[in-house]
Amino acid sequence: MAFKLRIWLWSTNVRSLENVVEQIRNIANKTGIRMRGPVPLPVKRLEVPVFRLPHGEGSKYWEHWEMKVHKRLIDLEADERVLRHLMRIKVPEDVYIEIKQMTG
């Protein structure tokens, strides 16, 4: 029985993210299932200003730290065999995955 899956991937490291997307693409090509995506979603930019005080005399200034979160979206029409293949993917620690079954 085939069902639709929506896979959300996000990471701060683009290379790791693209590596996981490529593994999913290879599984889709090998098994012959329909795959839509990967759809690149807008990059979320998080900026944290930190007030920095020097020791002794001197001027006060702000440091700005930044983190970018890259996201991808993939839709698959999968069966149990494909789902087993997806669970065996080696995912780096800095890549987060969310898989949901779509209805309709």
From Swiss-Prot:
Annotated GO biological process: translation
One Pfam family in the UniProt entry: Ribosomal_S10
Molecular function (Gene Ontology), one example: structural constituent of ribosome
InterPro entries: Ribosomal_uS10, Ribosomal_uS10_dom, Ribosomal_uS10_dom_sf, Ribosomal_uS10_euk/arc
Cellular component terms per the entry's GO annotation: small ribosomal subunit
SUPFAM superfamilies for the chain: Ribosomal protein S10
Presence of keyword Transcription: no
Keywords: Ribonucleoprotein, Ribosomal protein
Gene3D superfamilies, sorted: Ribosomal protein S10 domain
Domain of life: Archaea
Family: Belongs to the universal ribosomal protein uS10 family.
PANTHER family the record matches: 30S RIBOSOMAL PROTEIN S10 FAMILY MEMBER
Subunit structure: Part of the 30S ribosomal subunit.
Function: Involved in the binding of tRNA to the ribosomes.
Name of this protein: Small ribosomal subunit protein uS10
Natural source organism: Aeropyrum pernix (strain ATCC 700893 / DSM 11879 / JCM 9820 / NBRC 100138 / K1)
Species classification: Archaea, Thermoproteota, Thermoprotei, Desulfurococcales, Desulfurococcaceae
UniProt gene name: rps10
